[in-house]
Amino acid sequence: MESERIRTELLLEKAIKITSFLILEYANIDNSQWSMGGGTILMLNYHHRLSKDVDIFVSNTQYFNGLSPKLNDVAEDADFYQEGERFISLSYPEGKIDFVKAFQVSDYLPTLKHVFNQNIFVDDDIEIVTKKVFFRGASLHPRDLYDLATVYLGPRRSELVNALINIPEQLQEFHDALQRVGPGFSFSEDYGLDLVLDIPLGLKGREVDICIDLCNEVRKSLV
């Protein structure tokens, strides 16, 4: 598992250098107008699972199309890519880089940090998991549930609850989806090697129940 973590961090270092070069040199998007978030940042902060993908959230979308392999000489080296209205996804043997048109969904702003030998803006943990509920909570991605449960059981529980209070419609969709699978359900078999098993939280197999508890706590605050 340790060798897997080292390999992951090395490929992510390569990936962030690629994305930085793409953004700064080709798309002309200033580094103050994009941030790194998603499971990779949570992995670095909580060490709760492995994450091999890089998520770059672009707030200034004026030059977003410049990240496309159709227009970007560096991006065209990707083995495979997908484009949608709000995203450009580049796949490499080492992992995937997702560029996403996104806006801030909480009051927790990105901060400048030294990550993978780069000074970049990094999304706050609360913003990361709130985005997961806002943009795709109803889809019940197993990794999202595990991330949410991890943050909820951590020291920033009240901050997460307060952030979700401000997105009641998306929270309701998330809650309804959880109710459809029901208490006691687990996605644990879907994780494979994505989990780091030596953490003391003991949440593997309980992630759905923990997220239901989270929703119930937020809903009580809305009454």
Where are these regions (language model features)?
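Compositionally biased terminal segments of proteins
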Residues: M1-V223
